[in-house]
Amino acid sequence: TNALSYIYFDEKGLLKKKGTLRVFQDDEIRKLVPLIIQAFSVATPAQVVAVSSYSERMLLTDQQNYCIMFISDRSLNIAFSRIHMLQTYNDTMSEKKKYTKTKENPTRISHSRFWKLIPSAGQRLEPTHENWLVVDLSNEIYQQPVVQRVGTIDEKIKVLQDLRARFKLI
């Protein structure tokens, strides 16, 4: 869980947001971690675990992350091909059809025009790759209990909407 919590990126381009952003939000991590653990428990050392996550956003769009993970020399390797890529409903449906035909391989990509991973403590980029993190799982930061983070803007908006709905009922 800590490994996913400490993955950050900077956006590139004219429409970039300010500052460094987290790749995975807390709600995504809570959903993904049990599935990733289960996948690694049945994978052979030569297999990779493919991870695709969607964070729901307003106006019928989702943000997609896609990466593959594998363990080599006590390090978790995570290679991304998509980070916070906006998807409409139609895009999502066509993606599902595409994945039944072909699988993309993020290790064959060296960078993205839209983002760059920013290594945290105990992490480094694979040489010549801006999209591939190597996480040293023996680093003490990944041995610590998970710290609850402040919610995302979307999570805060949802809490406010829930509170307003409760007050209307009273």
Indicate where each model-derived feature is located.
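Alpha-helical, heptad-rich or low-complexity scaffold/stalk segments
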Residues: 152-170
